[in-house]
């Protein structure tokens, strides 16, 4: 988004929910699936030392809980009705099965494909400026955080690259100067967001004001009016009311190039343009020159605050229409907050295909948030595919 930062106080805690959020009056996406208890990665790939692959759903859903080495289970998951998945799959396997393959996949906490065995991210050590790639414990598994801990002992480290797992080489690096902020953005402290997933210690990406990542020259990302699906797992307890904590499709020149030149997932409680119900934070779509909760800047009563520690936020972009979905990344299914026409002046879209994280398309860097995982796909995912991805996220065991 390219307008100047709006008002709104920073919220850094104290807004946790104890269950999944549903939109007041909002309908669950058709083709979606209900909560079935928990999800086990039944038959997930087991690594040396008893590590189970991160997340994974079975055909028709699975029961139980996804078990990590500590025996923690993910509660209240969902089944992916109509989408064929197999144990050990990641979100990108599920999107591919739904004919909407990932063209970018970023995470510092886990592999997003069942067979992925490469590096998740790179850290740079402050003491001598050397770098280290951080991989996974096993194919399709969690980050090998012990590698980072050893490398960064006695000094500090920043996350210098978040690697693209899709094979398209759309790696996120330090965001360069842009129209709104004429200097590069800061890189995240590699140890600032430590937590556990299914008993494994991992590190997310903590992005205070002034921090951000970007890649302008990409391969396979949607341009013009091409359809796409984008989601990120973020935090409902660390956000603010400024522009713009985004993940997704943006301008390639780091400037505001007008309405429709972006399509990114926004999360926060900025109210200068669109907004949802209550005080936020909300899932919205940043389409440049406008952050929208529906087809106008009017408040959308069906877009509720999502205040759980881990939030799934999704935007589905089609020719002439877009959809917003979201939910608790620890439990339950996604809820549809909006599915309808684009705002006036946004048809057709003029997407350019860069990827941003934590900032606006013109490098506005006054927002804040946390990032754990996210993807961009080629094509608009079905509701059933979206729900199967959510089930996989729940199964990964965020915070367990």
Task: Give names to the regions the model predicted.
Residues 1, 73, 82-95, 101-103, ...:
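Extracellular low-complexity, O-glycosylation-prone Ser/Thr/Pro/Gly-rich "stalks"
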Residues 84-182, 224, 231, 393-400:
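GGW-centered surface loops in extracellular recognition modules
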Residues 115-129, 203-205, 232, 281-283, ...:
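Short, hydrophobic/proline-enriched secondary-structure or compact coil segments at domain edges
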Residues 99, 164, 230-236, 313, ...:
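Short hydrophobic/aromatic patches on beta-strands that form ligand-binding or substrate-lining surfaces
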Residues 1-87:
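Ser/Thr-rich, Pro/Gly/Ala-heavy low-complexity intrinsically disordered linkers and tails
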Residues 310-319, 324-327:
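Long, repeat-rich segments with strong aromatic
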Residues 159, 167-307, 319-321, 331-344, ...:
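Extracellular glycan-recognition modules
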Residues 347-371, 380:
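Extracellular glycan-interaction patches encoded by glycine-rich segments
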């Amino acid at each position: 988004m390219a307008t100047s930062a709006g008002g709104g106080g920073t919220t850094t805690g104290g807004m946790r929910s104890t269950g999944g959020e549903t939109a007041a009056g909002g309908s669950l996406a058709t083709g979606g699936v209900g909560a079935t208890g928990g999800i086990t990665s039944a038959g997930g790939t087991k690594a040396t030392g008893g590590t189970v692959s991160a997340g994974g759903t079975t055909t028709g859903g699975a029961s139980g809980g996804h078990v990590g080495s500590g025996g923690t289970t993910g509660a209240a998951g969902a089944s992916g009705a109509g989408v064929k998945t197999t144990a050990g799959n990641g979100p990108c396997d599920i999107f591919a099965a739904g004919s909407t393959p990932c063209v970018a996949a970023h995470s510092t906490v886990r592999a997003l494909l069942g067979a992925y065995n490469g590096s998740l991210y790179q850290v740079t050590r402050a003491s001598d400026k050397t770098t280290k790639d951080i991989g996974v414990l096993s194919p399709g598994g969690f980050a090998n955080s012990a590698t980072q801990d050893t490398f960064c002992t006695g000094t500090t480290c920043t996350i210098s690259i978040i690697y693209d797992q899709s094979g398209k080489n759309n790696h996120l690096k330090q965001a360069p100067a842009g129209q709104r902020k004429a200097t590069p953005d800061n890189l995240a402290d590699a140890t600032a967001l430590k937590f556990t997933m299914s008993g494994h210690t991992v590190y997310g990406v903590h992005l205070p004001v002034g921090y951000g990542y970007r890649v302008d020259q990409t391969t396979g990302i949607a341009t013009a009016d091409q359809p796409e699906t984008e989601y990120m797992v973020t935090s409902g307890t660390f956000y603010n009311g400024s522009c713009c904590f985004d993940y997704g499709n943006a301008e390639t020149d780091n400037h505001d190039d007008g309405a429709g030149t972006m399509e990114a997932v926004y999360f926060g409680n900025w109210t200068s343009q669109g907004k949802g119900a209550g005080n936020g934070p909300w899932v919205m779509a940043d389409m440049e020159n406008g952050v929208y909760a529906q087809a106008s800047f009017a408040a959308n009563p069906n877009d509720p605050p999502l205040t759980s520690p881990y939030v799934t936020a999704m935007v589905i972009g089609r020719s002439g229409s877009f959809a917003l979905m979201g939910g608790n990344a620890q439990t339950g299914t996604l809820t549809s907050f909006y599915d309808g026409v684009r705002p006036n002046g946004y048809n057709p879209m003029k997407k350019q295909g860069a990827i941003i994280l934590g900032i606006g398309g013109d490098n506005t860097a006054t927002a804040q948030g946390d990032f754990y995982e996210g993807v961009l796909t080629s094509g608009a995912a079905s509701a059933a595919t979206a729900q199967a991805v959510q089930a996989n996220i729940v199964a990964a065991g965020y915070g367990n």
